A protein has these predicted regions:
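A structural signal for well-ordered alpha-helical scaffolds and beta->alpha junctions
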Residues: 42-43, 222
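Charge-dense, low-complexity intrinsically disordered regions
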Residues: 53-371
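An N-terminal structural lobe/cap that precedes and organizes the functional/catalytic core
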Residues: 1-38, 44-62, 367-371
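Charged/polar, low-hydrophobicity segments characteristic of intrinsically disordered regions
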Residues: 16-39, 260-282
């Protein structure tokens, strides 16, 4: 915490009116090409912030989509069976909406939920029609969309949205179990009315977490650190997803490649990727260190970007084949996504190994299992 206190002192002029340094000091437009679009000053600030962390600090983060929350509610009555892979269907619908981002449908989620299902049906009909322009590239997608459309036609238009706050805490509980952390306290940034328990606190308790409290970030430096890191991850992730999202229906039948601007890095910008890579991918490794729902593409792409950037020894190595780096990243990211899909084919739950001693570990029911 002393290192973070030094960071706040050094950049005291960047504090907001509450006396905090927020991730809002980095505007979203500055992430257009990831860290390649950072100016020298922002590179220095982020470098100093990432230097606060070391290999002994535990971090956990969850990546989720509001679209996925809604899709899970619509299809809550659909379970996996020999006739239908409900999880794959939910994933495919979420991916389609995230990838193509149809504005009217996204808008209806918040403004007119009753129109959402009909809009969804029309969207898939339109996509099937457009995909016929490039059947070789879009054949599998078209088959999936036709199956989805058949299911959507059987669903009632009655829809009520209730946002669910449990998923991030479910992942956090799994992380604690995996790392064997029993002695902990969880302070949640207070939201809503001062005298009333927040929905996030209730969700954490319902998941089964203990030692819970709510606090103000002005009083807890740990909350400020977590808020800053979460904001940076979220903005870098959004910049990446925006770059890979189709901007018009006309271009949606072509392959989407990460813009060359992402790879026009200097050494200091490349070093930011390497620092973030070690923090997220190397230090305190764990299966549940990062967590997502059925739709995990964004998280996989994010981790792929960090791994891809980290493998370069210098910017000269990038520049030697600059025009092809987008294609290379696309191939690498697709390989990681395929590995994820292969794991999803196995519906058996993955249980992390919790060491008990050098000869044994505890399973999820507390039983002692020898290696």
């Amino acid at each position: 915490l002393q290192q973070y206190a030094d960071f706040e002192t050094k950049y005291a002029d960047r504090k907001d009116r509450n006396g905090e340094i927020k991730s809002t000091i980095f505007h979203q437009k500055q992430f257009k090409y990831g860290f390649a679009s950072f100016n020298k000053q922002n590179v220095q600030i982020l470098n100093d912030f990432l230097s606060v962390f070391d290999k002994d600090i535990h971090i956990y983060f969850s990546v989720s989509s509001k679209i996925e929350y809604l899709i899970l509610q619509i299809f809550q009555g659909y379970k996996n069976s020999f006739l239908i892979d409900a999880d794959l269907m939910k994933y495919s619908i979420t991916k389609a909406l995230v990838t193509y981002h149809p504005q009217e449908i996204i808008k209806s989620i918040y403004e007119s939920p009753k129109d959402f299902l009909e809009g969804l049906r029309e969207f898939f009909k339109e996509r099937i029609k457009y995909n016929k322009k490039n059947p070789r590239l879009k054949r599998k997608e078209t088959e999936t969309f036709e199956q989805i459309l058949g299911v959507l036609n059987d669903i009632s238009d009655t829809l009520e949205i209730n946002w669910d706050y449990h998923m991030p805490f479910d992942g956090f509980k799994k992380y604690l179990m995996e790392k064997g952390i029993l002695n902990y306290s969880l302070i949640i940034d207070k939201e809503g009315e001062k005298e009333k328990e927040s929905r996030t606190l209730k969700a954490a308790r319902e998941i089964g977490l203990d030692n819970l409290a709510e606090g103000a970030s002005t009083e807890h430096p740990g909350l400020r650190i977590a808020d800053m890191l979460a904001g940076i991850i979220a903005k870098l992730l959004k910049g990446l997803c925006d770059s890979l999202r189709y901007q018009s229906i006309e271009e949606s039948t072509d392959k989407k490649i990460l813009d060359i601007g992402w790879f026009r890095l200097n050494e200091a910008q490349l070093e930011l990727y390497k620092k973030l890579y070690w923090l997220i991918c190397e230090w305190q490794p764990a299966w549940y260190k990062s967590y997502s729902g059925i739709y995990s593409d964004d998280l996989i792409l994010f981790n792929s970007l960090l791994n891809f950037m980290n493998h370069f020894e210098s910017v000269e190595q990038i520049q030697a084949d600059l025009d092809m780096q987008g294609e290379y990243f696309n191939a690498f990211a697709c390989k990681q996504l395929m590995k994820y899909f292969d794991r999803r084919k196995n519906k058996l739950p993955i249980e992390p190994v919790i060491p008990f001693d050098k000869e044994s570990y505890l399973n999820q029911r507390g039983g002692k299992v020898y290696y």
